[in-house]
């Protein structure tokens, strides 16, 4: 059990992240987090000002993990193959870590989204760099990145809410075929 003396903001955010991984954002509360850390709820205010700030920190933690994961999955690939690996990595992360639907819907309720937006733009930067290397037209690459991210995130949400009945492999194959069509048509 954690003690007040050993608490830090990092410890509080790590425990909150663990709770969200296990039970989702709806399970995250000051009272539950304090119980998990074996402290009084008011003790948490020293480390995180309010539940929204805590949610932001957890979202940023997940986005950092997603960015690192996607980067690791595209190493050694280029062009369309790297884009397909990126899409697969986002979908796999959403299926096994935290659904992007949960993350994005919680983000929608946050009053100050600047840090979250910056992380999402950092995530978007990976396919942007890949596509810019393929295209001499800046506008073309920008539009393709927007379409790609919309396709990936929309597809992840479609799966997350249970509207896709296939296996994960089938989902990845379907997403990849749609991305290939998009990349070929541009």
Put a short name on every predicted segment.
Residues 110-136, 142-146, 173-180:
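Amphipathic alpha-helical packing segments from all-alpha helical-bundle domains
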Residues 22-25, 45-56:
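HTH DNA-binding helix-turn interface
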Residues 96, 149-167, 181-186:
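Amphipathic C-terminal alpha-helical segment
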């Amino acid at each position: 059990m954690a003690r007040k003396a050993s608490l830090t903001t990092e410890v509080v955010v790590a425990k909150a992240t663990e709770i969200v991984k296990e039970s989702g954002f709806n399970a995250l509360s000051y009272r539950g987090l304090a119980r998990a850390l074996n402290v009084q709820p008011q003790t948490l205010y020293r480390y995180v000002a309010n539940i929204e700030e805590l949610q932001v920190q957890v979202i940023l933690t997940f986005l950092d993990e997603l960015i690192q994961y996607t980067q690791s999955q595209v190493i050694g690939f280029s062009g369309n193959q790297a884009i397909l690996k990126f899409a697969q990595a986002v979908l796999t992360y959403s299926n096994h870590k935290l659904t992007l639907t949960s993350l994005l819907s919680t983000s929608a309720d946050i009053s100050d989204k600047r840090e979250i937006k910056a992380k999402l733009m950092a995530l978007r930067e990976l396919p942007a760099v890949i596509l810019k290397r393929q295209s001499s037209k800046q506008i073309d690459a920008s539009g393709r990145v927007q379409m790609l991210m919309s396709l990936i995130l929309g597809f992840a949400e479609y799966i997350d809410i249970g509207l896709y009945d296939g296996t994960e492999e089938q989902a990845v194959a379907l997403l990849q075929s749609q991305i290939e069509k998009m990349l070929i048509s541009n």
